[in-house]
Regions:
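Helix-loop-strand module that forms the ligand-binding subsite of alpha/beta enzymes
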Residues: 1-55
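Glycine-rich phosphate/pyrophosphate-binding loop and the adjoining helix
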Residues: 49-113
Length: 113
């Protein structure tokens, strides 16, 4: 997945500004928070708002069908879906009424200049 996202975010030239992103991760046990963090970095580097939920967007399960038994994870996904839909509608309305925020020309530095 990371290889695909590298290609999509660094090699493609379509504007991703103000397109809503949301990461969803699934694991047997540990590793969700680190993966969630890594995936969200793609959105933040591309001027994309991130939809959130009531907890990190993760669900747990090892084998086929096990994730469907994670009640808290399923609730997190439902809340995420509603929040993402609201955020997308809000951005569309704001864009229609106020336009997009003014873009600045990107300045490249090496942390000291």
């Amino acid at each position: 997945l990371i290889a695909v996202l590298d290609r999509l975010f660094y090699s493609s030239h379509f504007d991703k500004t103000m397109k809503v992103g949301a990461s969803v991760v699934c694991a047997r046990r540990g590793g969700c928070s680190a993966t969630f963090d890594e995936l969200n970095k793609y959105f933040t580097i591309a001027n994309m708002p991130i939809a959130s939920s009531q907890y990190w967007n993760s669900i747990h399960g090892r084998g086929p069908g096990e994730a469907s038994e994670d009640e808290e994870g399923k609730q997190t996904m439902r809340v995420l879906a509603r929040n993402m839909a609201f955020l997308m509608k809000s951005i569309a309305l704001g864009k229609e009424q106020f336009g997009l925020p003014e873009a600045e020309e990107h300045v490249w530095t090496h942390f000291i200049r």
